[in-house]
């Protein structure tokens, strides 16, 4: 089992190689990447688009592997155990990991195509969008669509966000949360067309099903992704929404695994970075001889949009459950809203809008499956004495940075070693360099203010 070939060079593949080496794998690892860039954190593309970060800061650390860029794997010969590429090369493997990711699902709109229609998936996409001038329409009001609209607004564009559902981020937010998000975006300057679909594109204008016309020299599609399964299909591996894997992240061929956006586990192909990283961690441990199992990922989503503090935990369905205790705090005058769904004193779902102090506490309680404090209001308001999930009150093994699996103990050790600011802690531990959602938590832990621009530019390099 010395030769491992990884098809794909995104965050999941990079994390896998890092963890394999950390577990002591000394064999040959070959990585085949389609893009021209070395591995980078695509989760933060929105921050590049709004100029908070530069493209260089998204680069992930160099790994100990033979990395091939600008190559596409075209065929798996399972009998000979080799992967063929479009360059004509063959790469033999003892174990093969498919981390092929996903591709944007572009809408078919009469009159729209070519340079007028753009996805936001790669650094190259980011550069093309960044070079555009004039009004922009964003299709899709999910997480990526909201982040893209906010980023484009920050660049000075006139932005219209078109979403077919009545409220934004409908997979993560309830009606109230979606309405508050729409109000906040509207106040910032984003034009919203909710409950509408684009039906045509004519002379620089997007025509909606309401007959409204939206000016758009460029249309950015944030309308979902499709798992890249073609290689697996050609190899005869079972594929549904993604490449089907078991709890050991194996396909029907015991020598072939799949992780990340391309994988379907237990009927789910989440497309979330947290799932990709947890799968990479689990697979690395398994390939190193461990006996772990991947059982799914607890979903915590934090919007990365300048000036908006919003997090969603679990499924929106949990918030509407009739057999759960639901705690709601609404403060419309200050643009704040919180909703918790509890079952047996544990958090099963949450929406937190405008409560940055509570996000860390609620996330930790959810992650660790801990009972919530009796004083629910104190939890939401972030009252330190009543919040066992606050960073300073957490046990040493609590994970502060989910993206890079950085514990409070590791951060404390780095702080004692001289890393006294958020950027210094980022360099020492890589905390905050994933999705950026733990910046405030790390800042509170070290008693330093969190400057998001400074921490990410220095920490993610």
Residue positions per predicted region:
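FAD-site-proximal beta/loop scaffold in flavoenzymes
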Residues: 113-134, 202-207, 211-278, 371, ...
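Glycine-rich Rossmann-fold phosphate-binding loop(s) that bind the pyrophosphate
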Residues: 8-11, 34, 121, 139-144
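FAD-binding core/adjacent interface of flavoenzyme oxidoreductases
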Residues: 1, 60-137, 207-209, 220-223, ...
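Local cysteine-cluster metal-coordination motifs and their immediate loop/turn environment
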Residues: 397-411, 427-447
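Rossmann-like dinucleotide-binding cores of NAD(P)H-dependent redox enzymes
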Residues: 135, 145-199, 276, 294-305, ...
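Mid-to-C-terminal Rossmann-like scaffold of FAD/NAD(P)H-dependent oxidoreductases
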Residues: 2-3, 262-360, 386-400, 405, ...
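A short, polar/charged loop-to-alpha-helix boundary motif
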Residues: 356-374
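Beta1-alpha1 glycine-rich phosphate/pyrophosphate-binding loop at the start
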Residues: 1-67, 151-172
């Amino acid at each position: 089992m010395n030769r491992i070939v990884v098809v794909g060079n995104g965050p999941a593949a990079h994390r896998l190689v890092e963890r394999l080496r950390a577990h002591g794998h000394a064999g040959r690892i070959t990585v085949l990447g389609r893009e021209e860039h070395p591995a980078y954190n695509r989760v933060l593309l929105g921050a590049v688009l709004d100029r908070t970060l530069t493209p260089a800061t998204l680069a992930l650390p160099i790994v100990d592997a033979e990395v091939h860029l600008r190559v596409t794997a075209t065929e798996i010969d399972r009998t000979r155990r080799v992967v063929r590429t479009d360059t004509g090369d063959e790469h033999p493997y003892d174990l093969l990991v498919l981390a092929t990711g996903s591709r944007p699902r572009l809408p078919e709109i009469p009159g729209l195509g070519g340079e007028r229609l753009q996805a936001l998936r790669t650094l190259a996409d980011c550069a093309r969008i960044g070079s555009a001038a004039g009004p922009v329409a964003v299709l899709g009001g999910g997480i990526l669509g909201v982040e893209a609209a906010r980023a484009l607004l920050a660049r000075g564009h006139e932005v219209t966000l078109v979403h077919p559902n009545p409220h934004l981020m409908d997979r993560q937010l309830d009606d109230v949360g979606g309405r508050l998000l729409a109000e906040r975006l509207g106040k910032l300057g984003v034009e919203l067309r909710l409950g509408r679909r684009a039906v045509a594109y004519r002379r620089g204008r997007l025509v909606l099903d309401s007959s409204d016309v939206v000016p758009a020299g460029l249309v950015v599609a944030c309308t979902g992704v499709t798992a890249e399964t073609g290689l697996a299909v050609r190899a005869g591996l079972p594929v549904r929404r993604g490449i089907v894997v078991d709890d050991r992240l194996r396909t029907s061929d015991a020598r072939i695994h799949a992780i990340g956006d391309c994988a379907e586990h237990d009927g789910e192909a989440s497309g979330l970075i947290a799932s990709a990283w947890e799968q990479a961690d689990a697979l690395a441990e398994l390939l190193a001889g461990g006996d772990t199992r991947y059982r799914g990922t607890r979903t915590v989503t934090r919007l990365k949009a300048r000036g908006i503090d919003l997090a969603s935990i679990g499924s929106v369905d949990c918030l509407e459950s009739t057999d759960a205790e639901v705690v709601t705090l609404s403060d419309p005058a200050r643009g704040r809203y919180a909703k918790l769904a509890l079952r047996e004193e544990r958090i099963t779902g949450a929406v937190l809008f405008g409560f940055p102090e509570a996000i860390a506490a609620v996330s930790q309680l959810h992650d660790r499956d801990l009972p919530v404090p009796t004083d629910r209001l104190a939890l939401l308001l972030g009252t330190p004495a009543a919040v066992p999930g606050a960073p300073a009150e957490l046990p040493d093994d609590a994970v502060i940075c989910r993206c890079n699996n950085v514990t409070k103990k590791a951060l404390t050790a780095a702080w004692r070693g001289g890393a006294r600011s958020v950027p210094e802690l980022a360099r020492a531990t890589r905390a905050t360099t994933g999705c950026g959602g733990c910046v405030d938590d790390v800042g509170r832990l070290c008693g330093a203010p969190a400057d998001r621009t400074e921490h990410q530019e220095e920490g993610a390099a």
